[in-house]
Amino acid sequence: SYVIDKMKKLYPGEQGVFVQYLQLALQRAGESIAIDGIFGPDTCSTVEKFTGKSGGCTVDDETWKLLIPYLKGYTTHLVEKGDSIYSIAKKYGTTEQAVLQANPNVESNNLNIGTLLIVPFDFEIVPDNVLYTSFLVEWIVDGLQARYPYLKTGSLGRSVMGSKLLYLNLGNGDTEACYNA
């Protein structure tokens, strides 16, 4: 799971890849915002709208904690009395199939109160409109594993820059393939 304290605090006027990630998360959360990498007035007002806080649009750890699920592509839901897979999927704007696929040990007609479910959001997890960093790759891999629990992931070590060298393992059998990008 991703550690929030690694996140960059963002201020109005900043530019760059983390501003793109902020804008991507806001867009995925349903806000109408362009992804241009510039923390201008539009981004500021959208952050205020998303957080419900006016008078300051600094993006701190508290704000990132709200946004990270939209970068990973899923959230979690603690089952309460009266919940059903249908009601949970509807609450988060996703499908029953996606919730069941992410939680293979859950019986749709027998939800236990207190069970923590993974709830994938209904959008493509791999973005094609932002620059990539090791941060984004880790979020994508985490999100893929949450959506597809049969997908195994791990780290082969670290790059010279200190980033994890991640791998994905899918399926079983005698044939193996390795792809490095």
Task: Give the label of every model feature segment.
Residues S1-G37, H77-E80:
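Acidic, Ser/Thr/Pro/Gly-enriched interdomain connector segments
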Residues Q27-G30, F50-G56:
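Short capping motifs at secondary-structure boundaries
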Residues V47-F50, V99:
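Conserved hydrophobic/aromatic packing and binding residues within compact polymer-binding modules
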Residues W64-Y70:
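Short, basic amphipathic alpha-helical segments that act as recognition/interaction helices
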Residues L71-G82, Y86-A181:
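M14 metallocarboxypeptidase catalytic domain recognition
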